[in-house]
Curated annotation (Swiss-Prot):
Pfam families: DUF2585
Matching InterPro entries: DUF2585 (IPR019691)
Major place of residence: membrane
GO-annotated cellular components: plasma membrane
Name by which UniProt lists this protein: UPF0314 protein Oant_0840
């Protein structure tokens, strides 16, 4: 066996282990949401690849305007693990990022957070994600992580800023406002968001 083949074998094994961990995390996430009473898919009876609706079908399909925020989560996790665990195999850093995103999805879909969104934002029609949407959000973070791993930091920062501005213009919401309104709501932001 050549030295190149021997050198690539541990790397492939780590990626394989990372992929298995990611699949296990996604399965646990979906199961947790199911047993917590979340609906599997949109009650409309279809699964759309994209839903631009901000009303009843929001967060019920595979992707929506908030998918942009989850891709940015992936960028942030890549940068975080590059700083705190730069020598860890990329596949394991990816699995850790997916684990954090999955935990966030479970928290985001808890009754406490759903009610907080409904009370403190313009999202009065938000009743939580479908399981399809929640798992797709985690996959979006995974994609964001992989994009950040491949592209120069300047490019991913530019993409993140573009996504934030685009969502702000189109739906008057984005990751930054979402965090602000979750942690310390401002009535003037809520009123502005309600003006759509």
């Amino acid at each position: 066996m050549s030295s190149l083949a021997q050198a690539s074998k541990p790397s492939a094994q780590r990626w394989g282990l990372g992929a298995l961990i990611v699949l296990a995390i996604l399965a646990v996430q979906a199961s947790w949401l199911y047993f917590d009473g979340r609906i599997a898919m949109c009650e409309c009876g279809t699964i759309k690849l994209w839903s631009g609706s901000l009303m009843t079908e929001n967060s019920q399909h595979i992707s929506d305007w908030y998918t942009l925020s989850h891709i940015i989560h992936g960028f942030l996790f890549y940068w975080l693990f590059t700083v705190i665990a730069p020598k860890a195999p990329l596949g394991l850093r990816l699995a850790a990022a997916v684990g954090i995103e999955a935990v966030w999805e479970l928290v985001e879909n808890s009754n406490f957070i759903i009610e907080r969104y409904r009370a403190n934002t313009s999202s009065v029609d938000y009743f939580g994600d479908s399981i399809v949407n929640s798992v797709a959000d985690t996959v979006a973070a995974l994609i964001g992580f992989l994009i950040a791993a491949k592209l120069p930091t300047k490019i991913t920062v530019a993409i993140a800023l573009f996504f934030e501005v685009l969502a702000l213009i189109v739906i008057r919401d984005n990751l930054t406002l979402n965090v602000i309104m979750l942690l310390h709501p401002f009535e003037f932001i809520k009123q502005w968001q309600s003006g759509l």
